[in-house]
UniProtKB/Swiss-Prot annotation:
This is Conidiogenone synthase PrP450. Heme binds at C400. The lineage of its organism: Eukaryota, Fungi, Dikarya, Ascomycota, Pezizomycotina. SUPFAM superfamilies: Cytochrome P450. Pathway: Secondary metabolite biosynthesis; terpenoid biosynthesis. Its cofactor is heme. GO terms for cellular component: membrane. It comes from the Eukaryota.
Amino acid sequence: MLLLWFGFFSFIFGVVIYRLYFHPLSKFPGPKLAALTSLYEFYYNVVLGGRYLWEIERMHEKYGPIVRITPHELHVADPNFYTEIYAGPTRRRDKDPRLVRLAGQPTSMFATVDHGLHSSRRAILNSYFSKKSIAGLEDMIQGKVQKLVKRLSMACDQGTVVKLDAASSALTADIISEYAHGFFPFLLDLSKFIPDKVLEKLWFHAANILRLQKLVRAQADVALQNGGKVDGQATMFGALCDPSLPVQERTLDRLQDEGFSLIGGGTETTTGTLKIVMFHLLNEKALLLKLREELEQYPSSTWADLEKLPYMRGTINEGLRLSGVITRLPRRAPDEALVYKQWTIPPNSLMSTSSHFVHTNSDLFPNPLAFDPERWIRAEAAGQRLEHMIVTFSKGSRQCMGNHLALAELYLVISTLVRRFDMDLYGVTADNIVTHREYGFGVPKERGEGLRVSITRVRDP
């Protein structure tokens, strides 16, 4: 027994000495406890509840722009180094296999560790998400938006409080499901976001997530048996089960994982951004009135025309800047040592930069926590290409391929809401909206019941 204890403590002592003095990252600055054990991160993220990102922020204030934040990971808080970590397709970047398991869809593109395999999987679907392809969906998106207008108009007539973020989730889930899989889960048609909490139970309850997974699996099975078609309609499943692909890439599990991943990725970013934008517009009505004035001067409602409106574009950019995935997305560069200032990062080291540190950088964005659409107009007038610093969709070879779809939805939905409805916040404060914790996406200090609004008037089109 004594020998067992001696062996155990000898092992622990060896790990401590190795991590502090001989590990490839041992020369990098940071707290010794973070270098020794991942329990340091565990304490902030689990015990304190999603607060490690702000502890990393404190580390950078103390130790500088590059910090060892776990025994095996570096974090760099320099926006100019972002595209080195999240590099383009000619430079290999692998994911951390320990982290992608959390995604829950192990054969999806999002959970693919290897750079080469990810590139080949992405190539299958790239054309579906090009800006040209998404522009071709505009009539379908507009049709869904008009259904939303009808539901919100009914809520106005009935004096019903609406959960605007739940409505957005329903809308975006319908759009990506119909486009990708040839079906939609009827969330918008059921209008369960009005007047009770049924939609929340339907969409976010674990049992119903499983139900949706089964539905996606059933559609994938139909597609596999019918040359990629569902009910005679061509879908993305057709590309995923193309006979030219390797057999292992055409399994039912693979189609289900990719299909469900598309729904999740096609819903959360858009909804989170819309929630941030609409909260700030309704919380500071001068912003809303300025946007409405610009929209009334240019009555066209096409995505292409809306993108040209300076204040509209600034509003969307501010929403993107203050929302989205803020968790670290670690990468490895297995084939090269990266150099940051006087530091050489050894090949295959885990490294990351949270979008939070780019989007709240006060040199790029003075008064970074303020929602200020005009900062983008000022930057453009000064010749600054500030939009290149929006990393909500990440950058490089693993950038979110659904960015054009998300942007189209945001421009079309937000412009319609501002044009067609007068509404007020209903029992919602900044503590229910502004990011205070990190659980992948930013989470507010107080969860509340979502972005609840009362609609006071339906305006003429």
